[in-house]
């Protein structure tokens, strides 16, 4: 477990340096993929993971091109980039144990925000050298931590798969900010047969560090309109 925690901390600090806003999370998707590609999970990318026609608030073609060029410069391989360069970012990972049991789903968001990160001595990422390398973009809402926790969970399930039953689906979701990305995965059918669904957020309520709060209510609803 200590190894998983240490790996999660390292991944979180790496992801924190490369924040990408919704539907442009190409480097992020690649970094997550590299962490989980050698597990027993079946991985789905691009149009296999999300329905592009169900996405809301997509970036412009110019923004997507800029993001793909940045990802290419980072070192994202062509095969991976070709699957996600059109805004079909994120990963869906599935483990079917082959043993009868419930289908459990987990969702971890991966996008950053259009915020310039502080360069102050009171800001730990700046002081310890892992602040954002992308001007005007920042992980200001903890999604770098969420993605890292999701990867750690996936690795834990994989390491203990012989003791499990049922099916596990883990969604590394693009474009949570603005509530734009979830519909693409929903319409793809990933949740159709899920019996239990879990998602989480770090620091959502003011509790002592290390405390888990099982429920939040009263402020998570939303309604969207398409204005033509």
Regions found by a protein language model. Give the residues of each.
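Flexible, small-residue-rich helix->loop connector segments that border functional cores
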Residues: 152-165
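Acidic/His- and Gly-rich active-site-bordering loop/insert found
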Residues: 2-139, 163-164
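Predominant activation on well-ordered alpha-helical scaffold segments within soluble catalytic domains
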Residues: 29, 33, 151-155, 183, ...
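Alpha-helical transmembrane segments that form the membrane-embedded catalytic/substrate-binding core
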Residues: 146-150
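A generic secondary-structure micro-motif detector
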Residues: 1, 22, 171-175
């Amino acid at each position: 477990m200590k190894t998983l925690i240490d790996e999660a901390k390292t991944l979180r600090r790496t992801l924190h340096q490369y924040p990408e806003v919704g539907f442009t999370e190409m480097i992020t998707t690649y970094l997550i993929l590299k962490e989980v590609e050698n597990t027993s999970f079946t991985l789905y990318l691009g149009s296999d993971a999300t329905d592009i026609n169900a996405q809301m608030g997509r970036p412009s073609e110019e923004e997507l091109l800029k993001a793909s060029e940045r990802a290419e410069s980072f070192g994202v391989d062509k095969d991976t980039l070709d699957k996600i360069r059109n805004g079909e970012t994120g990963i869906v990972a599935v483990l079917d144990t082959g043993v009868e049991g419930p289908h459990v789903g987990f969702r971890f968001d991966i996008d950053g925000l259009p915020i310039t990160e502080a360069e102050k001595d009171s800001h730990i990422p700046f002081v310890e050298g892992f602040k954002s390398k992308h001007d005007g973009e920042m992980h200001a809402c903890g999604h770098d931590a969420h993605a890292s926790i999701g990867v750690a969970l996936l690795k834990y399930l994989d390491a203990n798969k012989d003791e499990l039953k049922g099916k596990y689906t883990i969604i590394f979701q693009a474009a949570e900010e603005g509530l734009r990305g979830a519909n693409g995965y929903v319409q793809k059918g990933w949740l159709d047969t899920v019996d239990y669904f879990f998602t989480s957020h770090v620091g959502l309520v003011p509790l002592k560090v290390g405390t888990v709060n099982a429920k939040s209510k009263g402020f998570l609803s939303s309604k969207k309109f398409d204005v033509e």
